[in-house]
């Protein structure tokens, strides 16, 4: 399923953007229209370097607002977790207010986003919030799929193989054989010949057996 099919299913199969319908349409993008330098040089630049209508708060979140055509008023679109979500919200409002003359942050916003038929501020705010949330959900699914693949590969690599089992047993065997060298070192420190390792030695034997053992 391609991106157009996915979003057509999300917004309804009969949905058709008022901008993309009716002939060829090549939207004007923010990347092709560089922003003018900010006039306030004494203050920190809060505008996003590329996205239109997007500013960063001190908290790290992003806000979006758009000026209404031929008016001094602005429509507040909300506060968002990422700049991309705010940029999507901007595109909804820009298309609703300016149509094909809108400068968009994303080229696919012309056909991906559901644009309200009314230019009422509340309708635009609702559609902008919906577009931002849909974009967030899409990014979450992509991230989840990527992490799921990584986790699957990690689990496959972490399987306990028979070779690893044999290596673990071999280490235990070495530890057991190391007991003889330990006894050799102890005997050397006492200037005595090293005794043989008798794991089933009976401590109740007679003293003569001890003498015959050390005589060899």
Curated annotation (Swiss-Prot):
Expression triggers: By cold stress.
One Pfam family named in its UniProt record: AP2
Location (main, coarse): nucleus
DNA-binding region: 50-107
Ranges for region Disordered: 15-42
Family: Belongs to the AP2/ERF transcription factor family. ERF subfamily.
Function as written in the Swiss-Prot or TrEMBL entry: Transcriptional activator that binds specifically to the DNA sequence 5'-[AG]CCGAC-3'. Binding to the C-repeat/DRE element mediates cold-inducible transcription. CBF/DREB1 factors play a key role in freezing tolerance and cold acclimation.
Name of this protein: Dehydration-responsive element-binding protein 1C
Organism expressing this protein natively: Arabidopsis thaliana (Mouse-ear cress)
